[in-house]
């Protein structure tokens, strides 16, 4: 439990800060939001002046439900409000970055520039775009950042409202694909602990409900499925459809449920100028090595990379070349 090993340093940074800003990655998912809210509750229990930094204009369904239901209950600000809320003594400001360590994926580049004192709490692998000037608490053996924050909540003996416990549990359920991926005894214990605080499995399912049209659009990618070497599932979207990162990730998760499949790669456009690749593995195939060669990153279970100014066909060729090289090694 890396987060508990580093608790003393984290405690000191929190204690010394007058203003604390919490942010996660762009396109918030339930792990990013759940861990951010969990950290927010920890800080509030210590009477700290803290804010959630959220710049996203649109949200996936579960995140939207939570933010709507908690409207007015959380101190949420956008990037343009950060400077006005900073402590005049810059050494007394602290930025907590959750569920990502990549500078190009954070909610607010403004926060990165304005706040020199940074701590990253994350379960993803590092890469060339990892934020350099931060103290990093990283555990890529942990299922989710929500699991890491749950360890802190228990250790600090934080009193948590059942709904907040439910939100954090939903992040664990999301990132483990309902406890089928990257799940350990510690993951089950974290879920048990949140349940003991009143987390509701029924409400977790409510938060995980999907939009029918978005689900249908994602399923179209399954009709374009290709299997490489009888164990690698590969699919790509058409250039006419824009997907979110989490959409590609969900398809990559789904592909692992097919017989004999050990890893999956999904390619799709994230915007008009950006193509994303999402990859998943059962742990027997080194997807992180492939993604790092392509400029991305990850670990033995999941990873991603993005390409600017390239077509889907060009990205497909690059990914397949790296797969072929790895298969030949």
Which residues fall in each region the model found?
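Hydrophobic helix-and-loop "lid/oligomerization" segment in the mid-to-C-terminal part
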Residues: 2-27, 34-73, 84-94, 174-329
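Active-site cofactor/cluster-binding pocket
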Residues: 77-135
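Short alpha-helices
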Residues: 121-191
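Short, acidic Gly/Pro/Ser/Thr-rich loop/turn segments
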Residues: 29, 103-105, 126-128, 179, ...
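Glycine-rich, phosphate-binding/catalytic loops in enzymes
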Residues: 39-40, 112-115, 137, 190
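An acidic intrinsically disordered interaction segment
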Residues: 1-10, 111-119, 140-145, 149
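Acidic active-site catalytic centers that drive phospho-/nucleotidyl reactions
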Residues: 29-31, 99, 122, 175
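A generic local secondary-structure boundary/capping motif
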Residues: 11, 83-86, 107-110, 136-138, ...
């Amino acid at each position: 439990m890396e987060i508990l090993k580093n608790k003393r340093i984290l405690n000191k940074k929190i204690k010394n800060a007058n203003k604390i800003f919490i942010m996660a990655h762009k396109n918030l998912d339930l792990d990013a939001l759940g861990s951010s809210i969990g950290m927010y509750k920890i800080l509030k229990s210590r009477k700290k002046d803290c804010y959630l930094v959220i710049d996203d204009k649109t949200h996936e369904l579960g995140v939207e439900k939570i933010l709507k239901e908690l409207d007015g209950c959380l101190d949420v600000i956008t990037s343009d409000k950060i400077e006005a809320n900073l402590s005049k003594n810059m050494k007394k400001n602290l930025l907590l970055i959750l569920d990502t360590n990549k500078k190009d994926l954070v909610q607010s580049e403004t926060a990165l520039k304005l706040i020199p004192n940074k701590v990253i709490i994350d379960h993803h692998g590092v890469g060339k775009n990892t934020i350099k000037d931060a103290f990093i608490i990283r555990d890529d053996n942990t299922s989710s950042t929500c699991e890491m924050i749950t360890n802190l909540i228990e250790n600090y003996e934080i009193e948590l409202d059942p709904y907040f416990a439910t939100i954090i549990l939903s992040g664990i359920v999301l990132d483990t694909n309902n406890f089928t991926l990257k799940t350990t005894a510690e993951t089950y214990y974290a879920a048990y602990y949140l349940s003991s605080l009143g987390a509701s499995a029924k409400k977790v399912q409510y938060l995980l409900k999907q939009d029918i049209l978005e689900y249908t659009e994602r399923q179209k990618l399954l009709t374009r499925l290709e299997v490489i070497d009888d164990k690698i599932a590969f699919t790509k979207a058409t250039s006419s459809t824009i997907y979110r990162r989490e959409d590609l990730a969900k398809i990559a998760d789904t592909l692992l449920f097919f017989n004999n499949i050990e890893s999956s790669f999904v390619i799709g456009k994230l915007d008009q100028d950006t193509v994303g690749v999402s990859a998943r593995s059962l742990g027997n195939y080194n997807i992180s090595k492939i993604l790092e060669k392509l400029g991305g990153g990850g670990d033995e279970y999941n990873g991603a990379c993005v390409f600017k100014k390239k077509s889907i066909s060009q990205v497909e060729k690059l990914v397949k070349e790296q797969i072929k090289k790895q298969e030949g090694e």
